[in-house]
A protein has these predicted regions:
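A long amphipathic alpha-helix within ATP-dependent nucleotide-binding catalytic cores
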Residues: 178, 182-190, 239-283
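Beta-strand scaffold of nucleotide-dependent catalytic cores
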Residues: 150-153, 179-180, 194, 201-237, ...
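ATP-binding N-terminal substructure of ATP-dependent carboxylate-amine bond-forming enzymes
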Residues: 1-102, 106-107, 112-113, 124, ...
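Active-site nucleotide/adenylate-binding loops and adjacent lid/helix of ATP-dependent enzymes
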Residues: 4-11, 66-67, 109-192, 197-200, ...
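Short acidic/His/Gly/Ser-rich catalytic and metal-binding motifs that mark active-site loops
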Residues: 16-20, 159-161, 242-245
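A short glycine-rich, hydrophobically flanked beta-strand micro-motif that places a catalytic Asp/Glu
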Residues: 54, 191-195, 202-203, 277-283
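A short, local hydrophobic-aromatic micro-motif
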Residues: 50, 102, 130-131, 215, ...
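Short small-residue beta-strand/loop micro-motif enriched in glycine and branched aliphatics
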Residues: 102-104, 160-163, 247
Length: 283
């Protein structure tokens, strides 16, 4: 019987680590449930594995690779040196090691995390995106021809809805200027200004490289009396449990759709996946 490949599991942590750190207590907490599930699955399937918490030292990763000699790296690192913007740099480093790894490659991560570049790429591939402009600090806000209020204002380089709230949706020029100035001052970066398109919040996981598989879609829902203009994934909607309970927000599997709509949803997700050069898995 062939030997099972050795798996090095990497995840990000908030402080410096060593090769021999013990994470058994951390893995008991709810915040570590993803890591716990992965390690439990590897154990149940009989894969030999080692774990390493990554903070800000790629040399430590190299040392663990030399010691453990993994056949594959299970990469769960989403930030480096406590910055989500550095995720692609860790993936680039891992790619240089020449060891197969899970998840998306560095090119796809870089393109997908840039809200402006990703929209330009999708437009090139004839995938509809809202009309948008970038408002840089110290410059006039010049809307594209045909852009109409309401608009939504976001930091260009943040993720996980950081910097997005109900105040991000603006109804007039005065509100637009105020929100753009807020983004400039608070986040020290450009503001993305785009048309606000009301609709449903749907998330689709996609797996694969050449042959893609769309996973069952998930939907974020609100209590019935919540107005339509408040139904979008702000930071509090995603991460503030008290806020979610107050507004009756929950995530569920998307109810069955008309077959044509379902096919269009999956085709669009697959086109986005390929257009942004994603691979492995993404959502």
């Amino acid at each position: 019987m062939a030997k099972k490949p050795k798996v090095l599991v990497l995840f990000d942590v908030g402080e410096p680590t060593s090769l021999d750190d013990d994470y058994s207590e951390d893995l008991k907490s709810e915040d570590w449930k993803t890591e716990r599930h992965v390690l439990n699955a590897l154990k149940a399937l009989g894969y030999p594995f080692a774990v390493l918490g990554v903070h800000n030292d790629t040399g430590l990763i190299a040392d663990m690779i030399e010691r453990f000699e993994p056949d594959v790296i299970f990469n769960m690192v989403e930030q480096f040196d406590s910055s989500l913007g550095n995720e692609n740099r860790v993936t680039s480093f891992l790619e240089l090691q020449g060891i197969p790894l899970t998840g998306c490659g560095s090119t796809g991560i870089t393109l997908a995390k840039d809200k402006v570049i990703s929209k330009k790429i999708l437009s090139y591939h004839d995938i509809n995106v809202p009309k948008f402009v970038v408002a840089a600090p110290g410059q006039l806000i010049e809307l594209e021809e045909g852009m109409q209020f309401p608009l939504i204002v976001k930091p260009v380089r943040e993720e996980a809805s950081y910097g997005i709230s109900l105040k991000s949706v603006v109804q007039n020029e005065a509100e637009l200027v105020n929100r753009v100035c807020f983004v400039h001052e608070r986040f020290k970066q450009e503001a993305l200004v785009e048309e606000y398109v009301p609709g449903r919040e749907v998330y689709v996981g996609v797996l694969g490289h050449d042959d893609l598989r769309c996973l069952p879609a998930r939907e974020m829902t609100w209590r019935r009396d919540v107005p339509a203009e408040a139904r979008f994934a702000s930071y509090k909607v995603k991460w503030d449990e008290g806020y979610r309970q107050r507004w009756g927000i929950r995530n569920r599997f998307l109810p069955a759709l008309d077959s044509l709509i379902q096919a269009d949803l999956e085709a669009t997700c697959s086109a986005v996946y390929r257009g942004l050069q994603l691979n492995g898995y993404a959502r």
